[in-house]
Amino acid sequence: MQVLHLINMYLKHLSLTNFRGFTRLDLDIPQRVVLLTGDNAQGKTSVLEAIYFLAAFTSFQTHVDRQIVNFHEAKNPLAVTRLVADYQRDKTKQRIEARLILEPSGVNGQRLRKEILLDGVKKSANEVIGHFNAVVFVPQMSQIIEGAPDDR
């Protein structure tokens, strides 16, 4: 018999710097169901993408991390994108942070460096995955739910 341990976790605060269309965003998240509404291109999907990025350290929108760096910031010689989540897991308060740093490399080039911190301590993605959990379903994934077994 396998015992399943349920984790009580909720996101309390999300902070974004130079992420997608946001130069700065600070959101206090209430401990209840949250509904994101607004016109197109206002950042609703970007907020969801940021939350997912902090759980998986990859985007569900792109396979190129450089594309999530704010367009205007990416023009600078040194560009930094920062995502921070303050959350509570069971009864423990935690902070997870991801930094994407575009820095000069070679002649006219830039390289992207990713830093991940858990409670202020640098860690590898493998060490941190599973500390902050998120699941995303987008319309493109409908075949996973609705499709025939062979499609899944």
Regions inferred by a protein language model and the residue ranges of each:
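Nucleotide-state sensing region of NTPase/ATPase domains
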Residues: 56-145, 149-150
